[in-house]
Regions:
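Short N-terminal "domain-start" leader segments
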Residues: 1-20, 25
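Non-catalytic signal-transmission and effector/linker regions of two-component phosphorelay proteins
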Residues: 7, 61-62
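Generic ordered-secondary-structure signal
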Residues: 16-17, 21, 28-35, 62
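A short, charged, amphipathic alpha-helix used as a generic interaction element across diverse proteins
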Residues: 30-60
């Protein structure tokens, strides 16, 4: 069972941040912090980043 690395949280201004659960810091994609998102964007991005992270870990353990 793989533990998801990324999750999302609602900020005080109503926007959403995708963050790394191990560091608590906002995720970066191509150097851009993933904050100020709407809920749908954040939810889709969490799914994508977790999928890519799981694939990366599977490849390194082969």
């Amino acid at each position: 069972m793989h533990k998801n690395r990324y999750d999302m949280r609602k900020e005080n201004d109503g926007s959403w941040t995708v963050f790394d659960i191990f560091t608590g810091l906002p995720a970066k994609v191509k150097g851009v912090l993933q904050d100020g998102l709407d809920m749908e964007q954040a939810d889709d991005l969490v799914d994508l980043l977790n999928y890519l992270d799981i694939k990366r870990r599977e490849e390194t353990h082969r």
